[in-house]
Amino acid sequence: MGGHSSSDVASPRIVEGAEDARSASADRDDDSVLLRVENLRKEYRSGLQPLVLFDGLNLTVRQGEMIAIVGESGAGKSTLLHLLAALDRPSAGDVYFASTWLGKLTAGEAATFRNREIGYVWQLHYLLPEFTALENVAMPLLAREEPKPSAFVKARELLREVGLEARVNHLAGELSGGEQQRVSLARALVTQPRLLLADEPTGNLDNRTAEAVFGLLERLHTTHRLTSILVTHNMAMAKRCGRTLRLHEGRLHEVWLHSSESEEASAEGRIASSDAPGHPIVRTAVPGANRTGTA
């Protein structure tokens, strides 16, 4: 695309169809691309008319990126993560993880793929209450028949990384909400995945605890050399990611935010007001700079 005037660069913008502007053929030959989504469509049958969540959605994620996905409730953000993790199948279109086409995987192959390549953190921790923190974290390793001593060593190390070394033998129900989410994060990383998917990982936490958990997530993203995609309604956290993508009307739109607080507030207002029908989304070629930090 062409150059932009200083007025174009001076204010935050929302990039319409940012992923459509990428060259699909170039991405296929780019070794830095970890995840590629092409012309994704997802619909559900509801009566006579289908409910279409996505149609022609495209996404390219490169290794090491930390991406936030924002959008109004019901836009399909959680469904998109399910498709990226092969927990669900698209109605049309393709999802590629490195050189693997997820559409060819059987249910068993998809389960193995998730166990080895994907770490998943939900808003609800889904820990097994009758097991200790150590046992919960070791579960993905035990599921693939790794010997218990080895699995427990790795689980203990992850719990140390998330600051819960003193709580390894506590039952899940004996932990606070923040501690439970830390255990969930340790469980997601114990298999050394390349991709971390987090669906509202701080949504059930108070502000102080949410900030601590998100800071931990940032640090682990760096130390474990992860590629991370987070769904969040928290714009302050989204701004700390390398890219922010807004899911709106079945497409992803890149949101570019300046570091200036006044301009970021203006951008948040644009995003909020753009939920109204007919709101124009401005196209610009300026990408977001990498703002991923460590805590």
Protein language model regions, located:
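Exposed, low-complexity/repetitive linear segments and helix-based recognition motifs
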Residues: 5, 13-17, 24-28, 52, ...
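ABC family nucleotide-binding domain
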Residues: 33-247
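H-loop (His-switch) and adjacent beta-strand-loop-beta switch element
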Residues: 244-257
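ABC-family P-loop ATPase nucleotide-binding domain
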Residues: 1-43, 254-295
